[in-house]
Regions:
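Cleavable N-terminal export/targeting peptides
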Residues: 1-26, 42, 227
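Repeated loop/turn-to-beta-strand initiation elements of outer-membrane beta-barrel proteins
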Residues: 59-62, 77, 120-123, 152-155, ...
Length: 246
């Protein structure tokens, strides 16, 4: 169940990447494809083909359940408030490692970010909090990127550092006393500091729209990888998206 829900909506987590540079207000539609391998044991690769609908304005951005609003802008800095669902979790049908465990549910996060943009450099610091009291967790993310232009092709490497508190890690990667079995010892999650590096290629030259290919590698710290539910120390996600204006 959790796997199916995530497949339907995971593309919407990227509302700001599929637009032409210089556009200030637009309704978008298009298609996207994503593939990635979860780090949970026995949790298979996800392949997603998904329609995309969204709106990008000077202050308001809406992509399905993902919403951000620019509260203020001073020089090269902007301050945003944002709402986003967190499609993490599992139930016992997603993998044999989860059999006999309680469902870990998706949640909604609310938070804010400070963004700096100058000379094709972008730096953002964001903080998101679980408001449905599923994990009562917090995530802090710092991202640094730079856009290089090669004619109509834009290349953007991106480095991210994220912090997940112990509440978040314990909920999604921990094993409670009443969930212990022969292959699944008790585990209390610890806070985790993860690192990611991604690269995206974007261009407006195809079919009158905007195309983007992005690949990201994420390395997870011991607070997550020490869990008996986890088999990998990192994963790679690849996405291909095409959008155009209504």
């Amino acid at each position: 169940m959790i796997k199916k829900l995530t497949l339907c909506l995971s593309f919407l987590a990227f509302p700001t990447i599929a637009h032409k540079p210089g556009d200030t207000s637009e309704y978008l539609y298009g298609l996207g494809f994503s593939t990635n391998k979860e780090i949970y044991k026995g949790y298979n690769r996800r392949n997603i083909l998904l329609p995309i609908i969204g709106y990008r304005g000077e202050k308001l951005n809406v992509f399905g359940p993902f919403v951000s609003y620019k509260v203020s802008e001073i020089s090269d800095f902007s301050f945003l408030v944002q709402v986003a669902p967190r499609f993490q979790g599992f139930d016992d049908s997603d993998s044999t490692i989860f059999e006999g465990m309680k469902e870990r549910k998706f949640s909604m996060d609310v938070g804010a970010s400070i963004n700096f943009k100058k000379n094709d450099w972008k730096i953002s610091i964001s903080s998101m909090f679980d408001v449905l009291n599923r994990s009562n967790g917090t995530e802090l993310v710092t991202a640094i990127s730079h856009t290089f232009s090669f004619g109509p092709v834009f290349v953007e490497p991106r480095l991210t550092f994220s912090y997940l508190d112990s509440n978040h890690v314990d909920y999604y990667y921990g094993v409670n006393k009443d969930e212990v079995n022969a292959i699944r010892p008790e585990y209390s999650g610890k806070s985790a500091r993860n690192t990611g590096f991604g690269l995206s290629l974007s261009t407006p030259i195809f079919f009158g729209g905007f195309t983007q290919l992005s690949i990201q590698r994420t390395w997870f710290s011991e607070g997550i990888t020490d869990s008996p539910l986890v088999e990998d120390h990192g994963n790679i996600t690849a996405r291909l998206m095409y959008t155009r204006n209504f």
